[in-house]
A protein has these predicted regions:
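Short, conserved phosphate/pyrophosphate- and ester-handling motifs at nucleotide-, phospho-/glycolipid
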Residues: 46, 196, 258
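Conserved N-terminal subdomain of the carbohydrate kinase-like
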Residues: 52-135, 306-314
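Structural motif
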Residues: 4, 13, 131-132, 192
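Conserved beta-alpha-beta core of the PfkB/ribokinase-like small-molecule kinase fold
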Residues: 132, 138-215, 231-233
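Glycine-rich phosphate/adenosyl-contacting loop at the front of the ribokinase-like
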Residues: 1-78, 252
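Conserved phosphate-binding/catalytic region of the ribokinase-like
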Residues: 1-6, 154-155, 205-314
Length: 314
């Protein structure tokens, strides 16, 4: 029987500027709202692949909240742990691409419904039904989210469940009080670690990748996957190293690609796939994600990933 995957964290909508520029200081055309939030994108990808999936979060009793609930339910995610808060607003993020490819964001998360998450009886019951916990670093940056996420980690690992961890550390949250302690606490229990690029150096004393990987393996992390964006990805464990090359795609919107990659890798990893197989499908999931505007719009089914790999490898 497949393990049921739980994540905890922010749910919001994303609204995307259709022109490139630096920020939102003038009226401009926008598209959206799109369902979003790194944990929500991750768990939606898990659900799309048919792996049992669930999320604990909090949304407002508004159209933005319902938009997210409808998408997650349609993609097979257990939403019994999502509290719908009357009189509160669902979080939002406005995104605009700069000419150099970087992004400008305006967030409303901390003061949205998600920012007031607490441990509810429904959330506690959901924790008891899950065998694997996935932590996003963003969920450790707000007190309510962090408390619930760490409680889920404690309960699931105490029963022998497994833990995956994607730091997903945006620059604007790195100085959050208590974040470093929370990150270290989660890493100490992690079975599968999924940093992007140079994030791995935030967790080690090493100054080169091989030494950083060795340090983490020596500390008890079983599997490490380094996401390299358009440079592919690498898996490391005690048995060695596996690399996959990037897939060639037409990038439209990279937001959410790393979350889709992570969701696909965790799904295949939990199913017992070899590192090479899990990397291939995760790579395809990330590549598919960048072809759609909207961070959750590119979450793919197994058939869609098979087709993409068939085109790329055939």
């Amino acid at each position: 029987m497949s393990k049921k995957v739980l994540t905890v964290g922010e749910i919001l909508v994303e609204i995307v500027a259709t022109t490139k520029g630096d920020g939102f200081r003038e009226p401009q055309p926008l598209v959206g709202p799109f369902p979003s939030g790194a944990p929500a994108i991750f768990i939606d990808q898990i659900g799309r692949l048919g792996t049992p999936a669930a999320i604990i979060s909090r949304v407002g009793d508004d159209d933005f909240g319902r938009l997210n609930l409808d998408r997650l339910i349609a993609d097979g995610v257990d939403v019994s742990g999502i509290e719908v808060a009357k009189g509160e607003a669902t979080g939002s993020a406005f995104v605009r691409y700069r000419p150099d490819g970087s992004r400008a964001f305006v967030y409303n998360i901390a003061h949205s419904a998600t920012g007031k998450l607490t441990l509810t009886p429904d959330a506690e019951a959901l924790m008891e039904s899950c065998d694997h916990m996935h932590v996003m670093g963003t969920a450790l940056s707000a007190p309510g989210l962090s408390q619930v996420a760490r409680e889920a980690v404690a309960r699931i690992t105490a029963r022998g469940g497994t833990l995956s961890f994607d730091p997903n550390l945006r620059p604007e949250i790195l100085d959050t009080p208590g974040l470093r302690e929370a990150l270290d606490e989660v890493l100490a229990q992690t079975n599968l670690f999924l940093p992007s690029g140079e994030e791995i150096y935030l967790f080690t004393e090493a100054d080169d990748e091989a030494a950083a990987v060795k340090e983490l393996l020596d500390r008890g992390v079983g599997d490490i996957v380094i996401k390299r964006g358009n440079q592919g990805a690498s898996h490391f464990n005690r048995a060695g190293r596996t690399d996959v090359a990037p897939l060639s795609t037409d990038e439209v919107d990279p937001t959410g690609a790393g979350d889709c990659f992570g969701g696909a890798f965790v799904s295949f990893w939990l199913a017992g796939a070899t590192p090479e197989t899990a990397l291939r499908f995760a790579n395809a999931a990330g590549a598919n994600a960048v072809t759609k505007v909207g961070p959750m719009e590119g979450a793919a089914t197994r058939d869609e990933l098979d087709a993409l790999l068939g085109q790329s490898e055939g």
